[in-house]
Amino acid sequence: MSTADTTAAAAIDDPNVSSTKRITSVRRTAWDEPTGARLAMRYGLLVVITLLVLFPVYTTVLGAFTPSNRVLENRLLPGELTFDVVRNAWTEGRLGRYLANSAVVALVVTLFQLVTSMLSGYAFAHLRFPARNGVFYLFLATLLVPFEATVVVNLDTVQWLGDESSIFGGLNSLQGLAMPFLATAVGTFLVRQALLDLPRDLIDASRLDGLGHLGFIRRVAMPLVRPTLGALALFSFLSTWNQYLWPRLVIS
């Protein structure tokens, strides 16, 4: 009998140990030291899940190096490989420029969402103004409206704000691609919830030290809610990078 089994047995036999601790000790024994069959089943399941996740990536890479006339043959194993497709994408298709544009727009949107979410989240968490909760719930209600329902209005707004030479960009511009996504209700909600967990004594101490609202946000709040901001930045960048409908409409 292993040491863990001996400890679990002792915990079960000890009348001074509560029933909750007995169950916990038995559960820990079963999963901390799995048998060979259970360990093989666990790793087998992980391998299957990994293959399912990587299969679309594999087919995409395989299709990129397969001649155009053989892409639809649905072959799992690589046959004739060529770099012509990738080369044409970079030269004739200007893929490098498109990737750079996507990166610039995604970075700008991420930066603006972090700033606007931090400011609005702080306002809803620690500032006192009339109808604060009502305005916050109105922010959250915008999440119920799908983006497709506002596409026409956003498109008209971007077109009305100006052409490519104006500061707002308009259609066929990087500003037009980023404009509808510079602020997000999801970011406001996440930052507000994180700021509500800060102790009130910390805020009062910062006031005694002479920090204003912006000073508190920059020196105290931002370092403490860094995990939330990191998650928001990752979500914002990926969602902006993966957009298709809005760029397809704005860029003609």
What are these regions (language model features)?
Residues 38-252:
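A structural signal for multi-pass alpha-helical bundles of membrane permease subunits
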Residues 1-46:
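Transmembrane alpha-helical segments of polytopic membrane transport and secretion proteins
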